[in-house]
Structures are given as structure tokens and as C-alpha cells.
């Protein structure tokens, strides 16, 4: 039985701090990585994801899809044997809240026009 490839990954946060590195199998999904990032999120950060849907992982300039595996996301030309892959973490709050907040803000405003003839 062949040994499954394992990949070392660390996650770079918005402020330059890192989570990891951790070792994952090439068959691990991006969804699994996001769960790990949310569960290991450092205490005291100003931006904290509420769930995996608010987390985006970026590797080699591409946003990774949840159903892809680590092996599928790995770029062949950028890897150094024994090196650690750095994935950038972006927290993007869900849009549903911000859309409803905008509607509430616009509702009480009224347009008032006046004309003055001199």
C-alpha cells in the first residue's frame, strides 16, 4: 500500500501572524482546512470568523473552493521539497446582515427639496 502524501500548511492571517504549520494529507478538503482555521483562531483578534462560510483561503493568488482537496490546490512549480505552503486567510462577513442593515438605514431618510426665487 503506497504511503499517502502529506503536506505542511501554515495559514497567514490579515495582520501577518500565522496559524500552524500543520501537516495534512493530500486528500484533505479545503472545507476541513477552514474548520481547522476557525477552531484554532487566536484569541484577542479584532476580526473573528463566526463560521467557515466567512473564511476564504487563498493559495497562489486563487480563492480555494470548499470541495477541492489539498492535492488539487497545490501548485506544482512553486513547491520546494519539504517546504511549507502558506495559505492566506481572509475573513469576509456574510452579506445578508450588511444588506438588511443598509435597507434599514435607507428607510427613515426622506428627500426634502426646497426652491428659493430671488
Swiss-Prot record:
Residues 116-118 form a propeptide. GO terms for cellular component: plasma membrane. Residues 7-73 form the Ubiquitin-like domain. SUPFAM superfamilies: Ubiquitin-like. Keywords: Cell membrane, Lipoprotein, Membrane, Methylation, Palmitate, Prenylation. It is a lipid-anchor. Induction: Not induced by pathogens, cycloheximide and ozone treatment. Transmembrane segments: none annotated. The keyword Protein transport does not apply. Its main location: membrane. Pfam families: Rad60-SLD_2. Gene3D superfamilies: Phosphatidylinositol 3-kinase Catalytic Subunit, Chain A, domain 1. A lipid is attached at residue 113 (S-palmitoyl cysteine). InterPro entries: MUB, Ubiquitin-like_dom, Ubiquitin-like_domsf, UBL3-like, UBL3-like_ubiquitin_dom. Ubiquitous, but three fold higher expression in senescing leaves. It is found in: Cell membrane. A lipid is attached at residue 115 (S-geranylgeranyl cysteine). The modification Cysteine methyl ester is found at residue 115. The keyword Repressor does not apply. PANTHER family: MEMBRANE-ANCHORED UBIQUITIN-FOLD PROTEIN 3, UBIQUITIN-LIKE PROTEIN 3 HCG-1 PROTEIN. Heat stable and remains soluble at temperatures exceeding 90 degrees Celsius. May serve as docking site to facilitate the association of other proteins to the plasma membrane. This is Membrane-anchored ubiquitin-fold protein 3. The gene is MUB3.
Amino acid at each position: 500500500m503506497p504511503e499517502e502524501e502529506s503536506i505542511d500548511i501554515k495559514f497567514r492571517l490579515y495582520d501577518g501572524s500565522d496559524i500552524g504549520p500543520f501537516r495534512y494529507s493530500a486528500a484533505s478538503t479545503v472545507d476541513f482546512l477552514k474548520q481547522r482555521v476557525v477552531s484554532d483562531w487566536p484569541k484577542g483578534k479584532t476580526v473573528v470568523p463566526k463560521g467557515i462560510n466567512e473564511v476564504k483561503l487563498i493559495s497562489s493568488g486563487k480563492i480555494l473552493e470548499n470541495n477541492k482537496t489539498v492535492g488539487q490546490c497545490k501548485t506544482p512549480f512553486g513547491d520546494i521539497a519539504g517546504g511549507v505552503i502558506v495559505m492566506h486567510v481572509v475573513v469576509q462577513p456574510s452579506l445578508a446582515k450588511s444588506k438588511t442593515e443598509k435597507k434599514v438605514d435607507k428607510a427613515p431618510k426622506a428627500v426634502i427639496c426646497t426652491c428659493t426665487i430671488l
